[in-house]
Amino acid sequence: MSVARLRVRPELAWWGLSALAAGGALAAQALDPAALRWQPELALTEPWRCISAAWVHWSGLHLAANLAGTALLAALGTVAGCGQRAALAWALAWPITHVALLLQPALMAYGGLSGLLHAGVAVAGWQLLRGELGQRQVIGAALLAGLVLKLLLEAPWQGPLRTVAGWDIAIAPMAHASGSTAGWLCALVCGVGKPARNAAGG
């Protein structure tokens, strides 16, 4: 068997994170949300909540929308060429997204994949923007510009929660902002979009 056939696809790590996000959200339906959700007063004594908060969902619609978003993000990462560096950046952004919610102490509880998904979009958008000149960069720039516009329209500085027509829960704009920022910063730190130094690189 040739070396080419043995070579692991670079997107596998991205797919694995997507599966972990979706699988955890499904499994968490059988658990007590109070044991998993983000609560600022428990950040130091129960640090696992900066991971498990992503798996808590407040309604069936909330869960279904985020599972669909996770599937779309997995596909986006594949098209964008998100390899090991991008997956590492997204993984690092996971806990940072929720820890950053301490910046809005009025948000007394949070659960959901949306912050993590915003982080993934920021990473994938940066991957595209830092790629080869041409259409991919245009798509990356448009994706990131749309993300920034969305965050501005949500105005996270106006309060911890926002009621949106069509949703049966209130959204937390700060989670979207913290996720997007964490994803972008982690992408910078991890060198997302830079050429690998060798064939075994990320």
Map each language-model feature to its residues:
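N-terminal TM1-TM2 helical hairpin plus the immediately adjacent luminal interfacial "cap"
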Residues: 15-91, 95-98, 102-110, 165-173
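Mid-bilayer segments of alpha-helical transmembrane spans in multi-pass integral membrane proteins
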Residues: 98-99, 103, 124, 147-152
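N-terminal signal-anchor transmembrane helix
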Residues: 1-48, 129, 133-139, 186-202
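Internal alpha-helical transmembrane segments of multi-pass membrane proteins
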Residues: 84-85, 112, 132-144
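Alpha-helical transmembrane segments that form the membrane-embedded catalytic/substrate-binding core
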Residues: 63-70, 111-122, 168-190
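Terminal transmembrane helical module of multi-pass membrane proteins
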Residues: 141-192
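Short helix-perturbing small/polar motifs within transmembrane alpha-helices
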Residues: 118-132
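Central hydrophobic cores of alpha-helical transmembrane segments
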Residues: 21, 90-95, 138-149
